[in-house]
UniProtKB/Swiss-Prot annotation:
Record-level GO cellular component terms: plasma membrane
Organism encoding this protein: Neorickettsia sennetsu (strain ATCC VR-367 / Miyayama)
Cited PANTHER family: GLYCEROL-3-PHOSPHATE ACYLTRANSFERASE-RELATED (PTHR30309:SF0), INNER MEMBRANE PROTEIN YGIH (PTHR30309)
Locations listed in the record: Cell inner membrane
Quaternary structure, from the entry: Probably interacts with PlsX.
Name of this protein: Glycerol-3-phosphate acyltransferase
Entry-linked InterPro entries: G3P_acylTferase_PlsY (IPR003811)
Taxonomic lineage from the root: Bacteria, Pseudomonadati, Pseudomonadota, Alphaproteobacteria, Rickettsiales
One of the protein's GO biological processes: phospholipid biosynthetic process
Amino acid sequence: MASAFEMNRLAFIIFVYVIAAIPFGRCISACFGVDICTRGSGNIGATNMTRVMGLGFGSVVFMLDFLKAAAPVFLAVQCCSDVFASTVGFVAVFAHVFSVYMAFKGGKGVAPMMGVYFVLVLPVFIVAVCTWGIFFVLFRQPFISSLIACFIGAVYSYALLELYVFLPILAGTVLIFIRHTSNVREFLQAR
């Protein structure tokens, strides 16, 4: 029989999924009469919000998507192990990508992954943000910057974290790469 502690952790995981699955980009754009899913790339994330509605809206969506992972990971770090906190981070990324509120569709997962890095491994967050900035200046393609930043973040996480703490981060990174395959395909076809 499961202990009360294990049941509480399971309840917390479910709670994190329910909260992290909220598609903030879609909700905010709808408040202003815009269906973000039919504009720009059709994605609900910060990049498309910036493209369609401007930097202010994109920044708000980025922060909300960032916090949907950072806040529960912070709580998990305070009360449980880093392994559990990392698992909570993966659940937040997964919920963002496969939102129950959007028939299991969603964003690409980069903003919540940055939230995980910020709380769990701050040096990785700093390196990932700097990497994103450098490659955005070089290529002017947010998806290229995001993929390289997440890849570098995963490699650096592997160097800093214990294996069981790293594995959920690796799983989240793989998920982000899978969600960006259409971007890569379109980019290569345009060349």
